């Protein structure tokens, strides 16, 4: 069973619909301990302020169980957008600590690109990814993968061996990261049409 954590970030119903199109597994939106225990994959679809999301996570009665399942039992965990950002240690957007499951920091985009031109922030729209290493998350036959982004802050992973792909927007940022069973994507697969569908097909294969 695939579990999308409830009441933390937005877009959960859109994420569920896209996952249901991509695989034949049961998908639930819940924070119940029984569902967390039964899940094979846990998804955090985060949209919102870093501190607000961390407050909601820390207030969950099931938070310790989630940590146990992810860190000790190594159940698969996927963070989407801000759900990816809270996997790291800290963010320039807020003052609260992140989960710290992957070392790194979340930084705000500069207002100017490398040529001194004004950079529109937030980064909204379609963008491509630069593959750094092979991963089952990416389709080898689809070299021109493009995904839909909406964010003002970006992930800077400390250990680059966990970075699967980067994206260019004024500067390079980490757009897909994976450390063992824990993965994060900065883009929105649920808004990325055929590319998002294929991403979920690969992830759940």
Where are these regions (language model features)?
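Gly/Ala-rich beta-loop-alpha elbow adjacent to hydrolase catalytic centers
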Residues: 79, 83
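Glycine-rich nucleotide phosphate-binding loop and flanking beta-alpha elements
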Residues: 11, 49-51, 84-86, 154-156, ...
């Amino acid at each position: 069973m695939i579990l999308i954590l409830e009441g933390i970030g937005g877009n959960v119903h859109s994420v569920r619909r896209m996952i249901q199109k991509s695989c034949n597994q049961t998908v639930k939106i819940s924070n119940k301990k029984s569902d967390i225990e039964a899940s094979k994959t846990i998804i955090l679809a985060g949209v919102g302020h870093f501190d607000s999301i961390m407050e909601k996570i820390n207030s969950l009665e099931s938070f310790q169980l989630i940590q146990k399942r992810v860190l000790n039992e190594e159940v698969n965990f996927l963070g989407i957008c801000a759900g990816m950002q809270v996997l790291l240690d800290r963010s320039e957007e807020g003052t609260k600590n992140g989960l710290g499951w992957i070392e790194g920091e979340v930084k705000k985009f500069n207002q100017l690109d490398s040529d001194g031109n004004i950079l529109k922030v937030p980064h909204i729209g379609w963008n491509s990814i630069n593959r750094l290493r092979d991963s089952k998350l990416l389709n080898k036959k689809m070299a021109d993968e493009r995904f839909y982004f909406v964010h003002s802050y970006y992930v800077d992973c400390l250990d680059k061996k966990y970075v699967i792909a980067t994206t260019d927007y004024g500067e390079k940022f980490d757009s897909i990261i994976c450390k063992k069973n824990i993965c994060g994507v900065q883009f929105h697969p649920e808004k990325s049409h055929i590319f998002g569908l294929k991403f979920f097909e690969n992830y759940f294969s």
